[in-house]
């Protein structure tokens, strides 16, 4: 699998989140940014398991992604974060990212992987990034695909 392309494709899928009109659009990046414009989603660390099937036919990637929200008002920031962490709805990161799975019989992420699954939310807390404090959380995304490509 082409990890750099997968990172960018996950970020591109997250851009489809629809936030309320009064809020800025979600910004997204495939890598940990030096600085952010909140709210911001980015692909951070990953773990890779090779050879989940014979002949390099399947590798598994576990991406840790983060979403950070500005804290102008702690309650409204957490409500916005909650909406992005929900399992469904126009602001749901899970829902918009899993649309990139493609239809039945299609490869995920525009052909970059066999499948993906947003598995869990963790680490709901205050984060410091580039000297500023944000409320945020991590989403774990499993991606499986051809090991030899």
Regions found by a protein language model. Give the residues of each.
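Charged, amphipathic alpha-helical segments and their flanking helix caps
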Residues: 1-34, 45-149
């Amino acid at each position: 699998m082409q990890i750099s392309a997968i990172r960018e494709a996950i970020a591109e899928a997250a851009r489809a989140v629809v936030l309320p009109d009064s809020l800025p659009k979600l910004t997204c990046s495939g890598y940990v940014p030096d600085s952010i414009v909140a709210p911001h989603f980015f692909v951070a660390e990953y773990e890779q398991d090779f050879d989940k099937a014979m002949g390099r036919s399947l590798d598994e990637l576990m991406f840790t992604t983060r979403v950070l929200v500005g804290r102008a008002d702690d309650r409204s920031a957490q409500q916005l974060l909650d909406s992005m962490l929900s399992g469904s709805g126009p602001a749901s990161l899970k829902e918009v990212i899993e649309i990139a799975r493609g239809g039945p019989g299609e490869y995920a992420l525009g052909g970059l992987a066999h499948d993906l699954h947003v598995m869990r939310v963790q680490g709901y807390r205050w984060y410091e990034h580039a000297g500023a404090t944000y409320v945020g959380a991590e989403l774990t995304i499993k991606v499986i695909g051809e090991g030899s490509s």
